[in-house]
Amino acid sequence: MPKLGMQPIRRRQLIDATLDAINEVGMHDATIAQIARRAGVSTGIISHYFKDKNGLLEATMRDITSQLRDAVLNRLHALPDGSASQRLQAIVGGNFDETQISSAAMKAWLAFWASSMHQPMLYRLQQVSSRRLLSNLVYEFRRELPREQAQEAGYGLAALIDGLWLRAALSGKPLDKTLAQSLTSHFIRQHLPNP
């Protein structure tokens, strides 16, 4: 019989072990046995909590997307009366939070995006994450721009965020936060009438 209160601890162990395995060998080569070994548990524990590898991968991506949401919301909540420019920079900062730009997180995101084209549940998670980013950006641009311009600016800033992130992920080098901040700030200033 499982010990009370162990589920959150075990789930965290397994998600962390999954990220480690993806970081080291990639999503497709990360086996249940490798993940269980890294977590110090039997493969049966993975089946118990997640049913199979896909369930574990989905839980891992839910965890990463939850960390992204929290990183953005924490920054926005710190600026309740902030200008559109400040709040847009907060959204950018959340997307470049340490939880999102570690080697393990970046590799997991890349694998997640690739797998989402073939797995409906991962596709749904990817769409939710993508829509959330665009919605947040458009909402802030909309404070100072007409709807169509706000949508265009939001789409452009989302593409810039994704592009900077993707270039860093594929380079194998850490994201240059100073450069990312400079480029996104410039984009925001170009699109807001009163930055």
Curated annotation (Swiss-Prot):
Spell out the Pfam families in the cross-references. Answer: TetR_C_6, TetR_N
Q: Does the keyword Protein biosynthesis apply?
A: no
Molecular functions (GO terms): DNA-binding transcription factor activity; transcription cis-regulatory region binding
Write the signal peptide boundaries. none
Please name every pair of cysteines joined by a disulfide bond in this record.
Answer: none
Cite the HAMAP family for this sequence: HTH_type_BetI (MF_00768)
The pathway that the record names for this protein is: Amine and polyamine biosynthesis; betaine biosynthesis via choline pathway [regulation]
Protein name in the entry: HTH-type transcriptional regulator BetI
Q: Name the InterPro entries on file.
A: BetI_C (IPR039538), DNA-bd_HTH_TetR-type_CS (IPR023772), Homeodomain-like_sf (IPR009057), HTH-type_TetR-like_transc_reg (IPR050109), HTH_TetR (IPR001647), Tet_transcr_reg_TetR-rel_C_sf (IPR036271), Tscrpt_rep_BetI (IPR017757)
Where do the HTH tetR-type domain residues begin and end?
A: 8-68
Biological process (GO) annotations held by this record are: glycine betaine biosynthetic process from choline; negative regulation of DNA-templated transcription
UniProt keyword Cytoplasm, yes or no: no
Known function: Repressor involved in the biosynthesis of the osmoprotectant glycine betaine. It represses transcription of the choline transporter BetT and the genes of BetAB involved in the synthesis of glycine betaine.
Q: Which organism is it from?
A: Klebsiella pneumoniae (strain 342)
**What ranges are recorded for DNA binding?**
31-50
Record keywords: DNA-binding, Repressor, Transcription, Transcription regulation
